[in-house]
Amino acid sequence: MPRFRLIVEYDGTDYVGWQRQDNGPSVQGAIEKAVLSLTGETVRVRGAGRTDSGVHARGQVAHLDLTRAWKPYTLQNALNAHLSLAGERVSILEVEEAAADFDARFSAIRRHYLYRIISRRSPLALEARRAWWVPKALDHDAMHEAAQRLLGHHDFTTFRSANCQATSPMRTLDRLDVTRTGDLIEIRASAQSFLHNQIRSFAGSLKLVGESKWTPDNLQAALEARDRKACGPVAPPDGLYFMRVDY
């Protein structure tokens, strides 16, 4: 039974998240329906990351097994045709055959995310639901300086959801950079894996630094507190993008 690796882009606005759930449409469910419509097979599509409702992806990776040995290009085009016909905001950017032991989630060695903030007085029109609108000036240099305090291997209890199902709060953060181009502030994060709401918690806390409500020392103290109550407000999902997975 051949295994295929997919690179997937989606607008997460109208989905309950990547993972199939009973309370609304999911990205996983949309792809599985497209596969069923195309092949008649009921399959499980497994993703590298279970993004939440409203979170977008430019490079989610998934895998699935089919009984037929499809040509990757043909499978990609056919799935996109079925997704488009169903009105889904999901696009298959690439399909390739994968080794039988490849697992989109467990074979990953690093995941890369982007969080976008637009810092300006005027409300968002074209970027609505694509970024976090912050109608005030933010000091991105201070945000970047503070972000460097979080790099390395730490107990990130402060920055994970109370509902996080991970068995350990320990993670190694490889990258957390803050840059600015015009009104756009970008926070880029890389690690082998992240805790639930970890990046949105980073973004919300870094915003406090950008507003001069927190200093970099305050952010480090929040990390060292190992207490969810020490976290700043969790940033909305609109600005978060799953960008890429390394294997």
Curated annotation (Swiss-Prot):
Keyword check for tRNA processing: yes
- Quote the HAMAP family the UniProt record gives: TruA (MF_00171)
Alphabetically ordered keywords of this record: Isomerase, tRNA processing
| Role played | Formation of pseudouridine at positions 38, 39 and 40 in the anticodon stem and loop of transfer RNAs.
Active-site residues (renumbered) = D52
The protein's gene is named: truA
| EC numbers for this chain | 5.4.99.12
Q: Tell me what this protein is called.
A: tRNA pseudouridine synthase A
Cross-referenced NCBIfam families: hisT_truA
Give the reactions, separated by semicolons, that this protein catalyses: uridine(38/39/40) in tRNA = pseudouridine(38/39/40) in tRNA
